[in-house]
Amino acid sequence: MSRRGTAEEKTAKSDPIYRNRLVNMLVNRILKHGKKSLAYQIIYRAVKKIQQKTETNPLSVLRQAIRGVTPDIAVKARRVGGSTHQVPIEIGSTQGKALAIRWLLGASRKRPGRNMAFKLSSELVDAAKGSGDAIRKKEETHKMAXANRAFAHFR
């Protein structure tokens, strides 16, 4: 039994312009080589492009996209008796959001296009509509969990 106390859960800070935690989470995930100002530029350009495309509040589109991509359940590899089973586990809200953001950014990086802001805005709009690679990834994960329901007791 460890004598150390449990680490306190950090609350996500909000970004300077929109005062939104989701935007800040996106910025921190898109960050490469410590270039945070470039990450902010990419996100803010993507938000402007969303505003131009949909003519609605871009933050609501962002929220809707992340809510649509957030998985409820995932599979985790568990070794039992010499064989590895994919065990379905429920995911908490913060972990689900983190996964959703990771999938959205991965899908937007794979997209063909000019720059990251354009690709990210396209992926977010598609995810808000219920299509796109990130949504497909969520459905794939849910299918895997449903297929491996028999191993749920290995948790």
Swiss-Prot record:
It comes from the Eukaryota. GO terms for cellular component: chloroplast; small ribosomal subunit. CDD domains: uS7_Chloroplast (cd14871). Keywords: Chloroplast, Plastid, Ribonucleoprotein, Ribosomal protein, RNA-binding, rRNA-binding. It holds the Pfam family Ribosomal_S7. GO terms for biological process: translation. One of the primary rRNA binding proteins, it binds directly to 16S rRNA where it nucleates assembly of the head domain of the 30S subunit. Belongs to the universal ribosomal protein uS7 family. This is Small ribosomal subunit protein uS7c. It comes from Aristolochia macrophylla (Dutchman's pipe vine).
